[in-house]
A protein has these predicted regions:
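N-terminal low-structure segments adjacent to metalloprotease catalytic domains
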Residues: 1-49, 279
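N-terminal short leaders/motifs
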Residues: 4-6, 133-134, 178-183
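Charged, low-complexity, helix-prone segments enriched in Lys/Glu/Asp/Gln
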Residues: 35-37, 68, 78-83, 273-279
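Alpha-helical scaffolding within the catalytic cores
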Residues: 42-45, 108-112, 194-200
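Juxtacatalytic substrate-recognition/specificity segment
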Residues: 47-164, 255
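Acidic/His/Gly-enriched intrinsically disordered linker/tail segments
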Residues: 143, 147, 163-279
């Protein structure tokens, strides 16, 4: 198939997935840059001021300008933590947009989130309300820095997966979210009680639908469970296990097969060992 034919096929799939009617030029731009801008993203960018920091374009509002130095500092921190865990990776361009809760919810299709990352759009969305700027400056980690650390870790993880020649949908969400929570918990004392929440089978929080359902159950905390699982892997097997899992997972050998080979435990036994580790 010619490159023109590939682009036309990509245009058809892009419009089907986004519900839009993108031009051939927009399709080609998204294909070659691996960065698609939705209509909402274009609108938010057009209404924002812009500051460039290395490979990150920061889009912010005038009333949030005081947060830029802290944003740059947090991006440096996120990069240091992510590269420490995952090693080197090509730092492709990424956008970070400050936005209100309504826009964040529209982009993420999730309620009650403070941050969002789309690997398809190559964009991080961070909730910032102008009235909270002074509070953020006083207690930055809980209000502001943690979501940036979390979402940047997603960016780094997906970059590492892409460079390994794999696809993100081969990896369970608890693994992806666990890495992000581990990075976001740096310099933080994590309080946990494995008896406080219902522990879910990891395979039930592997894909999107199961994850969304788990977020709605008051007796569960899939983010904490993901953190505990990834932290266990790091503490017991060392940080290199994350890259090993990424590099060895592929279409013919799935994540759970690789996990069992590395840990010597099928997933059910692995889950029990994680619980026993924290008890």
């Amino acid at each position: 198939m010619s490159i023109f034919g590939i682009l036309k096929l990509f245009q058809k799939e892009l419009n089907a997935s986004t519900g839009g009617n993108e031009t051939f030029y927009t399709t080609a731009k998204a294909f070659f840059t691996l960065n698609y801008d939705s209509e909402l993203e274009k609108k938010l960018k057009a209404e924002s001021m812009k500051r460039k920091y290395e490979h990150v374009s920061i889009f912010y509002q005038e009333e949030n300008e005081k947060l830029i130095p802290m944003t740059v500092e947090t991006l440096q921190w996120a990069e240091e933590m992510s590269s420490g865990l995952l090693g080197r990776y090509e730092k492709n361009p990424i956008d970070l947009i400050f936005m209100d809760r309504e826009h964040l919810q529209k982009l993420s299709n999730l309620d009650g989130v403070s941050g969002y990352y789309s690997n398809f759009d190559k964009v991080m969305g961070i909730h910032v309300h102008p009235e909270n700027v002074e509070s953020i400056l006083e207690t930055p980690l809980s209000y502001f820095q943690r979501p940036i650390l979390h979402e940047y870790a997603h960016y780094a993880t997906f970059r590492k997966i892409e460079e390994a020649g794999a696809f993100a949908d081969l990896f369970p969400l608890w693994f992806i979210e666990g890495i992000a929570e581990y990075v976001a918990s740096d310099q933080t004392e994590v309080h946990y009680d494995v008896n406080q929440y219902e522990i879910l089978p990891l395979e039930s929080i592997t894909w999107g639908d199961g994850w969304k359902e788990a977020r709605q159950i008051e007796t569960t905390d899939p983010y904490m469970q993901s953190y505990l699982s990834v932290n266990y892997l790091i503490q017991v097997f060392g940080e290199d296990i994350l890259v090993e899992l990424i590099q060895k997972t592929n279409d013919t050998e799935g994540f759970y097969t690789v996990l069992e080979k590395i840990t010597g435990k099928p997933v059910a036994e692995f889950e029990q060992e994680v619980l026993d580790y924290y008890r």
